[in-house]
Amino acid sequence: MNNYQLTINEVIEIINRNTDINKLVAKKDNLYPTDLYDLDKQQLIAIILNSDFALSSIKRALLEVTVEELREQDNDDDLDEIDNELYEGAEAADVPRETIVKVFEADKSIVTFNGEKLKHYVNVDDNSSSVDEVKKIAKEISEHDFNENKENK
């Protein structure tokens, strides 16, 4: 069974790094793991919940424990075989349309740059004039000072 809980030593380490909690703990002569049960639990919880440092420390410790648990669980060879079969069986047709880099005529949209509508579409033919237009537009965009409008406002 997986255990994602912090150890008592990790909790003590987090408590020892937090000054507000230390003030509460300072009421005790020596802090042992069992002494945590003797602390004013409501006060301790309030301090932890109001301390970004304590919360982030606890979250970080829990994440480290979770990552370590996941590393230990990743020894399942059957799942690796299934993953390999899935990747090997993937075809280009299986890839969703949104991930395919291609401009379709039906996907025409109006884009503007400096107030001018850009209606140029890239064709597969590299020698076409539309590719030159796109390169020209890209050059204009790269040379354009976008901070110019911000300064005038």
From Swiss-Prot:
Which keywords accompany this UniProt record? DNA replication, Early protein, Viral DNA replication
Nucleus: present as a keyword of the record? no
Superkingdom of the source? Answer: Viruses
Q: Name one GO biological process term.
A: DNA replication
Range of residues in the leader sequence: none
Alphabetized InterPro entries for the sequence: Phage_Gp17 (IPR035184)
Q: What family does the database annotate? A: Belongs to the phi29likevirus protein p56 family.
The subunit field of the Swiss-Prot or TrEMBL record says: Homodimer. Interacts with the histone-like protein p6; this interaction optimizes the binding of protein p6 at the viral DNA ends, thus favoring the initiation of replication.
Function description:
Involved in the replication of viral DNA. It is required at the very beginning of the virus amplification, conditions in which a low number of viral DNA molecules enter the host cell, possibly to recruit the limiting amount of initiation factors at the replication origins. Once the infection process is established and the other replication proteins reach optimal concentration, it becomes dispensable. Optimizes the binding of protein p6 at the viral DNA ends, thus favoring the initiation of replication.
Name of the protein described by the UniProt record: DNA replication protein 17
Naturally occurring in which organism (per UniProt): Bacillus phage phi15
